[in-house]
């Protein structure tokens, strides 16, 4: 099999949450532990940092990886989902896992995986851990896939755990209250390992405190951190929510130093200032066009869209155009209620099975007072917005990671940079 054949095999032979949603979710660590034993516990050969949370965990993971790279470490980075290429999920010092490694791993191990029937995420986690061990990384930044307690990344014993925040998402698996969701994400907290909590609410803070107390884990709240260890940092990531992510990271850095990491001010500043270049991060308030400005962002739940709408209010423009699509298992009405009514809307759908049909989204949006037209795919919606926009207008593309993925996959055809 070549690389495309291998991806087709992966996408079709194991259930992929990105495509089918809940039916791909496998609760429990039985498969993970079986895989870990088969591959001889590769995660034990490298140090790690574990990052969970409803929103912001991808940005935090990439920024931490960038800082560690600039400090001279060989850094593995495991995140999800990917936007354009599967290999984005697994990187070392910003470079995606080689196609040849993916091909070889699947060819050699399919006989092991097929009787096990792992999920797509279980299989890719095994691939990532094996790759990081084979390539002898010094440290890996590991982003939780979903939740925490039963996530298949939760076999690692990291130097530091981070939980960015708690909002409503994946409630069918994690619970229908913030406290229940916090309880699942607090499952990554382990005995004696310091944990940083990025944001809390009155419902979630007691959950974290109790878990830290019962496990004997030192706990630190970024909201209470007023230290200025690195004054004058320039942040490449411009989303409003990145300010909270930065405080979370800055709270974690002293704990990493205590764990023996060498992190000087230059590495920290360079990591924050060059995270996109160093790690390949995409889709976070990413600018793709001037005159009119076109911005995309992967925020896709009430928590993420809240920050996006606040940032849209700060932009200067003649007319706002919003290209939006969502998947069918999100709080669609909750998101639509947050969006500005004065914008012109372009309702579309992503090229995944979970995508909500654009006509259904338009119907729900009209009930929320949002006016616009339907387009069959993201490129068609973007072209329509480009044609209707004047240079002083502002185009926003989002509502789902998969909408952003389709946008980025077609950026050349759409004359975007």
Range-by-range predicted roles:
Residues 160, 173-180, 185-188, 193-254:
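Internal gly/pro-rich beta-alpha loop/helix module
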Residues 81, 124-173, 205-234:
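Extended acidic/charged loop-beta regions that coordinate divalent cations
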Residues 1-53, 60, 66, 70-71:
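Short functional linear segments
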Residues 54, 75, 141, 164, ...:
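Residue-level signal for inorganic ion chemistry
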Residues 139-144, 152-162, 167-170, 230-344:
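Nucleotide phosphate-binding/pyrophosphate-handling subdomain across enzymes
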Residues 200-220, 293-294, 302, 335-394:
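C-terminal helical cap/extension that packs against the catalytic core
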Residues 22-29, 34-44, 70-156:
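ATP-dependent carboxylate-amine ligase catalytic core
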Residues 400-417:
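Glycine/aspartate-rich loop-and-adjacent alpha/beta segment that forms the canonical ThDP
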